[in-house]
Structures are given as structure tokens and as C-alpha cells.
């Protein structure tokens, strides 16, 4: 029985010890363990695989993906970072820039501003094309001039009161429709995601006047096209109490973990520790600093249970980004199968 439990732990758990991490390699391949049928089976995979949405709001999404290998999870993460397309500033035509920010630095800043535009409605611009069209380009104008405020108090030293337009924000960017874009996109739908991003600061007499061309691209070409601020995953924590922990030791144990992981209950007049929500733990391994407690707890992670966290830049909702990443991964698989079918067998 103990041997079977040890094998099951090696197959399904990554164990965090005091001086190292065990079972880090995937070992559930055919023939590795006697009595285990680890051969690939489509029906079994479909039965065990699931996706559970845990939390979602306007910009963030947390979901569980269960029943997959690390290679698939990491491929999915990399697609979110580098292969889901967005629209971003690619070319900046500077007509006048008398601010202290150099033209090339200003253009770089503008490129990193997330643009609220659905990239699925646009095409990639063909390489070598200089002039954009309504199907592959968005155009923005930025024209701001700083002047003195004639109504400012004489003893004021606050630039916000002394000057007009001394701070250039993304709200100053004006969309200039190309072709029939004004008919396709309602007013206010094409704009920077946030209107309070500071671009530059001016002083009286200084001016920025330029035109921006936004094109469709992917993060693999440039990070400005990446649709996510963060896209990460971690394995589901599995914390097990190997022996009862009571009294002051229970309180001490709860302090070794993230809030909410260990709860202390009153049982027959005694304080008793129990694992309440292992998911919340960050695995600081603080428990191994306490000689009396470290043997009472086993820290592990479930090998095939991935907790994904996706934070959108605001260009698209996070659930849309995830669905687009799934489509891209499916397309890669189809192309791979087509290549295999095209190979002539000897």
C-alpha cells in the first residue's frame, strides 16, 4: 500500500522539501510504472481535461486548466504573450516637436500606448507598403501647444495653474478616420485604452504636432503588440497536515502561510489547525524555519492542475484573448498535421 502511494505521489505531485524539490520531471509515460496504463487515450484525456473560470472582471481573468502537461500550458502562455495580434503605433510623422523629448523617444512612447481597436476587424499591412488603407491602418493626430494662463494668480508656482496644456496626455490624441472607417466604427470606439497616460510635458511656446499610423502586429515582432500586461501560470498547491497541530503551535503554523491557507478552529476546547484553502499559498516555505513544525506538513503541487492568471492591457477583454489564443494553438496543430500528411512515406 505504501509503495503504491509513493508511486502515485511521484506521478501526480511535485513535492517541495526543505533542501530541494522532488518529482519535477514528468514520468507518466507508457511502461514507466508497472500496473499503470499511461498510454495516450483520447477519450480519457477528454474525460479528465477541464477548464474552470475562477474569477473574471474587465481586465483580469483567473482560470484553472486541469489535465494537461507543462508543455501545453507553456505553449498557451507564450501564445498569449507573443502571437495574439493587436493594433499599435508603428509610424510617427513628426511635423513639429519643440519639447525636450527627442523625436525618437517620443515615437517610442507613443508606440507603447495601448489602442482600443479590435484587431480582428483589420488586416496585416503587406510588407513594403508605405501608404495605409482603411482595412489595415488607423490614424491618430496629436497637436498640442503650451501657453501661459492669463488668469493664473501672480504668486502661484504651480505649473498646473500657470500653464495651459503643459501636460500632454493620451486624451489629446484624435482619431482621423481613413476611407469609410467613420461609417464602420462609431465615434469614440477607436481611441487609446486610457486617456490619462502622460506622454510629455511642455512649457509656454513649446509644441508637439505629429501624425501616428497604427498597424496590426504580434508581440513576437515587438512587445508593443502584446495584448497582455501579464500572462502566467502556477501549479495548484496541495498542503497536507501529517499530524495534528494544536494549541499555540496551531497559531504559529497559521502564521507560516499566506492568509486564509491555515485556519485555527476550536475543537473540544482546544485550538486545532486545519488546511482551509491551499490555493492561496505562495509557497514561501517559511514552515521549514520552524523545527517543531516542519515535519508536520507536506508541501506539494498538483502536477497537471494549472492556475492561469491573465491581465489584459485593455485592448480586448481577457476572455476574448484566451479564446483567440486557443484558436491560434488549434491552427498550429492543424498545420502540423497537414505537414505530416504531406510527407511521403517510404
UniProtKB/Swiss-Prot annotation:
GO BP terms: DNA-templated transcription
Pfam families: RNA_pol_A_bac, RNA_pol_L
Outcome reported for the amino acid change (mutating residue 73 to R): Temperature-sensitive defect in the interaction with RPB14
Phosphoprotein among keywords: no
Top-level taxon of origin: Eukaryota
Record localization: Nucleus; Cytoplasm, Cytosol
Molecular function GO terms recorded: DNA binding; DNA-directed RNA polymerase activity; protein dimerization activity
InterPro entries named in the record: DNA-dir_RNA_pol_30-40kDasu_CS (IPR001514), DNA-dir_RNA_pol_insert (IPR011262), DNA-dir_RNA_pol_RpoA/D/Rpb3 (IPR011263), RBP11-like (IPR036603), RNAP_Rpo3/Rpb3/RPAC1 (IPR022842), RNAPI/III_AC40 (IPR033901), RNApol_insert_sf (IPR036643), Rpo3/RPB3_RNA_Pol_subunit (IPR050518)
Keywords carried by this UniProt record: Acetylation, Cytoplasm, DNA-directed RNA polymerase, Nucleus, Transcription
GO terms for cellular component: cytosol; fibrillar center; nucleoplasm; RNA polymerase I complex; RNA polymerase III complex
The keyword Signal is assigned to this record: no
Functional description taken from the UniProt entry: DNA-dependent RNA polymerase catalyzes the transcription of DNA into RNA using the four ribonucleoside triphosphates as substrates. Common component of RNA polymerases I and III which synthesize ribosomal RNA precursors and short non-coding RNAs including 5S rRNA, snRNAs, tRNAs and miRNAs, respectively. POLR1C/RPAC1 is part of the polymerase core and may function as a clamp element that moves to open and close the cleft.
HAMAP family: RNApol_arch_Rpo3
Family, similarity comment: Belongs to the archaeal Rpo3/eukaryotic RPB3 RNA polymerase subunit family.
Alphabetical list of PANTHER family matching this protein: DNA-DIRECTED RNA POLYMERASE (PTHR11800), DNA-DIRECTED RNA POLYMERASES I AND III SUBUNIT RPAC1 (PTHR11800:SF13)
Assembly notes: Component of the RNA polymerase I and RNA polymerase III complexes consisting of at least 13 and 17 subunits, respectively. Pol I complex consists of a ten-subunit catalytic core composed of POLR1A/RPA1, POLR1B/RPA2, POLR1C/RPAC1, POLR1D/RPAC2, POLR1H/RPA12, POLR2E/RPABC1, POLR2F/RPABC2, POLR2H/RPABC3, POLR2K/RPABC4 and POLR2L/RPABC5; a mobile stalk subunit POLR1F/RPA43 protruding from the core and additional subunits homologous to general transcription factors POLR1E/RPA49 and POLR1G/RPA34.
Name of the protein: DNA-directed RNA polymerases I and III subunit RPAC1
